[in-house]
Amino acid sequence: MERPTGVYFQTMTMKQIRERLKQCDLIIIPVGSTENHGPNAPTGEDTFLVTRMAEQVALKTGCTVAEPIWYGYHPYHHIGMPGTVPVKDEAFIDYLVSVIAGFWNTGFRKQILLNGHGQEFVIPIAIHKFAKIFQVPAIIINLNWYHAIQDKFKTKEEGGPYETPFIHADEVETSWSLALFPEFMHQEWAVDTEPKGFLPEGHIDKAGNLLHRPIAWYGHVGGGPIEVVAYPEGVVGKATLASAEKAKEGVEALLDYLEKLVRDIMERFPAGKLPPAEMLSQRPKEELEALTKEPLTEGWRNLYTAGNLWG
């Protein structure tokens, strides 16, 4: 992420950023976490997954990648696990709002928050909070990578490559990590655990709600144990079954989808263009024109004059 690959916002000068905005004003913001993923995988696994994905798509499409959000939201059953760094709910949401606003004010009015962690139900709150505060035209999308290719997580019984369903630091997630950043993995240290639940199977879903069960994985407290007690290893499932080969088809499909998403947005709304402002906001026309001008040009108003971000 510190290498001058030509895709990361924080490695660019403002001159380079201005030139890039003329070609593509879409930025991908990887939203990850710092979380215990067992003895064999790095604590930044969720973050590395989405940064590697974003890098590949940016190299193909010309979009920009923000340095990732390293610390994320965590549900109750994650709390207390060493190696996991949870952020207070309100602080996480407000931090995302601030990041979205900062990039919008710079000229990136099209943003994809590419999520790699179990916080898919929180990120949309930040997107809508941004919209409510500022009420400016924008395309802000939350994409959870595992939702883009749900058919690629099938078990062998369903015609897929995996022995077990996707949970956490398990066969599936470890396979994807081996495919995307093998240099950080120590598969010789992998361990297995047995997933536990207090209700019969079929009610509560697992990671990403990929099984389409009635109750979302985050829609309960008490349906399963807390991780620090039940899974001190940091693994929920069979990490030893993982291999990069199992994830290969899914990785290719996901990158294809991400590339398509970026290209579809940019073809519909080329650099400098957005959906009709009058369809997205009831702010006065003159105000919207000033806010959406190229930053630092004549008549431009900075975004922070349009809403109170500071409470």
UniProtKB/Swiss-Prot annotation:
It catalyses: 3-dehydro-scyllo-inosose + H2O = 5-dehydro-L-gluconate + H(+). GO terms for biological process: inositol metabolic process; riboflavin biosynthetic process. Zn(2+) 1 binds at residues 35, 46, 117. Its cofactor is Zn(2+). Zn(2+) 2 binds at residues 37, 46, 173. Its EC number is 3.7.1.-. Coiled coil: none annotated. Binds 2 Zn(2+) ions per subunit. Pfam families: Creatininase (PF02633). SUPFAM superfamilies: Creatininase (SSF102215). The proposed catalytic mechanism involves two water molecules. The first molecule is bound as a bridge between the two metal ions and attacks the carbonyl carbon of the substrate. The second water molecule, that is bound to metal 1, likely functions as a proton donor in catalysis. Homotrimer. This is 3-dehydro-scyllo-inosose hydrolase. It comes from Thermotoga maritima (strain ATCC 43589 / DSM 3109 / JCM 10099 / NBRC 100826 / MSB8). The gene is iolN.
